[in-house]
């Protein structure tokens, strides 16, 4: 194992104490009992938050000690980061060892390359094939990757939507209760849900990497992480939840990969994006509370199926890693990791109904102006909502649209922001709507 932090400690405890992988315990009910013989760390003297069985496991500081050990069959990478982790993963595969990792950044950017390397190694030495497991890289406590690899082989997936970040789901839940963004961010940091630098979570970057992986598994097409339109939750306000409530909705940060329909020349194109989204309260995705995760898959055979569970944490993530280890050890890993339908068109100017909140200084003709600007932008307005105005110098109104392209909504918001009555750039987000 490379790395011995929170998740690595959980992996060690599950394997050595619960699966009987230590020399003093041998009670596993599995066909194969794994043993962690070496753990590579930067500082061997550092105190760990798990008890090491020194009779079974050796702490080392040089990864070559693992790579050169012919008795090691599987390398578990839980060190984090990208550069060192990538080098370690590639070197492990080249040395004939299977690899299990939880590294979403590595997988999101390099999955095609890793699978090509696995195939190359196996072609060179077919008598001892290597495997690659990465279940824990997305929604740590939900076996969503294995589900996509093996549960939809005879199906056609039309859409994957996921609440894949527990931190932002917790924060949005508190904002729905009336807590301001700044206060709930501090609370999330105090509870350990959010990092001191919360950018990856609140700006949607974490979800962006995860939906890139799920899109590859569901549709067989690689999507550059940087090309994915991504909006976080930093512009969401308590007032947005008030409007959402009046519409029978809540707000969730969702990663989406969808085959677009009703899109003219781009009909059938794949759109992948991350954004806060208005979700009806009776929708499957509205069920995720606290730091929980939900993934909803819409397919031809099953319709909509949802998968729910903890998205992160020591033992949920470690459990997914151990599940991969056991699949590798028992030779039950899927041989084809994703559908080979790589010719699908990518078009991230996605189509949706949209919610647009406009902050303005009250005056005559504002609704008419917004309607005219919408017409110029090719946007059809579905409804206009307004909470009672208590301050005419700083009021809000909400426009919901019929289905239109992201580029059209951005153009409309740019035009509105230039008007004298606009106090700020409009806040917009897609909606899950039946119309």
Residue ranges and their predicted role:
Residues 17-52:
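NAD(P)-binding Rossmann-fold cofactor-contacting core
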């Amino acid at each position: 194992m490379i790395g011995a932090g929170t998740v690595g400690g959980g992996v060690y405890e599950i394997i050595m104490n619960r699966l009987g992988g230590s020399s003093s315990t041998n009670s596993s009910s599995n066909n194969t009992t794994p043993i962690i013989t070496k753990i590579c760390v930067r500082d061997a003297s550092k105190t760990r938050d798990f008890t090491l069985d020194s009779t079974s496991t050796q702490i080392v500081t040089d990864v070559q000690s693992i790579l050169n050990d012919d008795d090691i069959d599987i390398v578990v990478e839980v060190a984090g980061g990208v550069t060192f982790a990538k080098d370690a993963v590639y070197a492990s595969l080249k040395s004939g060892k299977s690899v299990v990792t939880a590294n979403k950044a590595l997988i999101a950017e390099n999955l095609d390359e890793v699978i090509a390397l696995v195939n190359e190694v196996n072609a060179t030495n077919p008598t001892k094939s290597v495997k690659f497991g990465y279940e824990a890289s997305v929604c740590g406590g939900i076996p969503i990757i294995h589900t996509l690899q093996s549960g939809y082989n005879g199906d056609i997936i039309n859409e994957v939507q996921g609440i894949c970040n527990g931190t932002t789901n917790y924060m949005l839940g508190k904002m729905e209760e009336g807590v301001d963004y700044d206060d709930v961010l501090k609370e999330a940091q105090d509870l350990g849900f959010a990092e001191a630098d919360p950018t990856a979570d609140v700006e949607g970057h974490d979800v962006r990497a995860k939906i890139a992986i799920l899109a590859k598994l569901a549709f067989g097409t690689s999507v550059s992480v940087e090309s994915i339109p991504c909006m976080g939750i930093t512009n969401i306000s308590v007032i947005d939840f008030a409007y959402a409530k009046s519409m029978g909705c809540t707000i969730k940060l969702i990663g989406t990969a969808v085959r677009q329909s009703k899109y003219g020349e781009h009909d059938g194109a794949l759109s992948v994006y991350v954004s806060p989204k208005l979700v009806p309260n009776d929708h499957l995705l509205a069920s995720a509370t606290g730091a929980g995760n939900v993934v909803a898959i819409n397919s031809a055979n099953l319709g909509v199926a949802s998968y729910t569970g903890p998205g992160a944490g020591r033992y949920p993530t470690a459990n997914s890693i151990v599940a991969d280890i056991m699949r590798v050890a028992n030779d039950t890993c899927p041989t084809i990791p994703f559908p080979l339908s790589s010719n699908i068109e990518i078009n991230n100017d996605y189509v949706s109904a949209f919610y647009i909140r406009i902050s303005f200084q009250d005056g005559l003709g504002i609704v008419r102006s917004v309607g005219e600007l919408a017409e110029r932008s090719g946007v059809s307005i579905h409804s206009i909502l307004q909470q009672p105005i208590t301050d005419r110098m700083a009021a809000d109104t909400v426009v919901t649209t019929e289905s239109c392209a992201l580029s059209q909504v951005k153009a409309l918001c740019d035009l509105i922001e230039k008007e004298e009555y606009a106090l700020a750039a409009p806040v917009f987000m897609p909606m899950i709507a039946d119309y």
